[in-house]
């Protein structure tokens, strides 16, 4: 369709004269218009053919860009760079994230110690070089799947391994720090509380038993901790250094505000060694001059005394108080017994014992003769006066005499004797009828006019 330039009437393209006003159309203009429409149509067809190619080319460009973006963040080299940057910049949180595994959570404080350990024991420049070379070799290798970075002394500090792929094209590199178990061995049952893996942790260690406190990555550690024992609560640190271990464990050094007590006794020469005790803060323990007692908290006073026995009587020292301000890691104290009081008592008891032993010597000399006469004559009356009537021993000897099973004895010796009220216990060494030397313990009762009678006996 075309419009008449004179009256505006619409007309077909092939009409040459306007039917309304008679205006004659220009045939060249119509021909040009037709040619132009055909060109436009041809160009449209060409454009429609080019669109798929343009879209495909655009998608290809996007894929190439995406590949390079993925490579920048996911290639082994890129993964290495992330770890290197974190260590170079002391980014402990990033290092903790990279090194944490399902089985071992690494917290930021551990990561901080680890970063410092790498810089001290490997050197940052050497570590970066070793890491890049290791990753490059693993990436190119078809057989190797893991390798270690080591310190100057040859200890493993980082395990680098291939762990599948990322986005099909790139090897996935895993960075894992090897771990060791720090171990404690307290002298008494101890509870330790500290922070590990970002969480509070409690470990209970039995006395004189090796106990691990967890798994830690390489480093030189000084961990704030609290420990509790029967003696009290202590604030301090648990210290351990991977440089000091060539095994799977590392010894822990305890650094707490504690006092250890060495005790010296004076005036105790007459006391039985096995009876000597030390009482610290109401807790009684056996005494040893070579033993150190503790540890005890340095922030609390300590009360201490000692006791011991001589001839059955207990003697004690005065109780001393050690002020908290005077407590040191190694604290010495001397406790004094009243030696004169002890010696006077021992002398008195020895006189009594000598008198008692003399009585017993006389008694058992007569008893052994009576016993043998009863055996030879099969007559209980010979020995009955030496045994208390109604006692189980009385009935037993009477039965043995009647059966002829009474044992003959000779050469009685008094080894030891003690008197408690009207009861006496005596250890007597005898020769039996087989000629063998035996020790027997007798219990006697002292009646009126100091008369002694046997109540019971037993083998020592």
UniProtKB/Swiss-Prot annotation:
One of its GO terms (biological process) is response to antibiotic. InterPro entries: Mem_prot_TcaA (IPR023599), TcaA_2nd (IPR054529), TcaA_4th (IPR054530). Residues 71-460 are extracellular. GO terms for molecular function: zinc ion binding. The chain crosses the membrane at residues 50-70. GO terms for cellular component: plasma membrane. It is found in: Cell membrane. Pfam families: TcaA_2nd, TcaA_3rd_4th, TcaA_5th. The keyword Repeat does not apply. Residues 1-49 are cytoplasmic. A zinc finger (C4-type) spans 4-21. Its main location: membrane. The keyword Oxidoreductase does not apply. Keywords: Antibiotic resistance, Cell membrane, Membrane, Metal-binding, Transmembrane, Transmembrane helix, Zinc, Zinc-finger. It is a single-pass membrane protein. Belongs to the TcaA family. PANTHER family: MEMBRANE-ASSOCIATED PROTEIN TCAA. Plays a major role in decreasing resistance to glycopeptide antibiotics. This is Membrane-associated protein TcaA. It comes from Staphylococcus aureus (strain bovine RF122 / ET3-1). The gene is tcaA.
